[in-house]
A protein has these predicted regions:
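Short conserved micro-motifs at the rims of enzyme active sites and ligand-binding pockets
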Residues: 41-45, 64-65, 72-73, 83
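Low-complexity, glycine/alanine/valine/leucine- and proline-rich hydrophobic stretches
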Residues: 45-67
Length: 135
């Protein structure tokens, strides 16, 4: 739109064509993630690394051990009922897993343990394993 060249390091979708009346680049699935659990969701409170996708109809999440959560966002908007291990949902879980795999590959996300990212990005941690914050 502004004729500025987008650097190769910029991640995400370019909606410029859509704004000009063209194709929508969105495939309907957004990545959700917790690269390293800390703060309000620290390990001591059950926090864990995860990657997932959210579509209009479903949310699917994996932790480092594998599939973890799957919700029907239309029937269960508060995500109270994990459908992952409910018989009959295997195909849906498999389809959502493939979308997640494709998204992670497209974003070069290796989905490694949180400590790898803490070291890579040189985050300082306090004694609780949380990035300190002061206002």
């Amino acid at each position: 739109l502004s004729s500025v060249v987008i650097p190769k390091t910029v991640e995400g979708l370019d909606f410029g064509e859509l704004i000009e009346g063209g194709k929508n680049p969105n495939d309907g699935a957004a990545i959700i993630s917790c690269p390293a659990p800390f703060g309000q969701w620290a390990r001591r409170w059950g926090g864990r690394e995860f990657r997932g996708i959210r579509t209009v109809s479903h949310t699917y999440v994996e932790d480092l051990r594998g599939p973890w959560l799957m919700f029907d966002n239309e029937q269960d908007p508060y995500q109270l009922n994990n459908l992952l291990n409910v018989p009959g949902n295997e195909k849906l879980a498999g389809d959502l897993k493939q979308i997640l795999k494709r998204k992670l590959k497209a974003t070069n996300d290796e989905f490694l343990p949180g400590q790898v990212y803490v070291k890579k990005w040189a985050y300082p941690l306090d004694k609780t394993g949380t990035v300190p914050y002061s206002n």
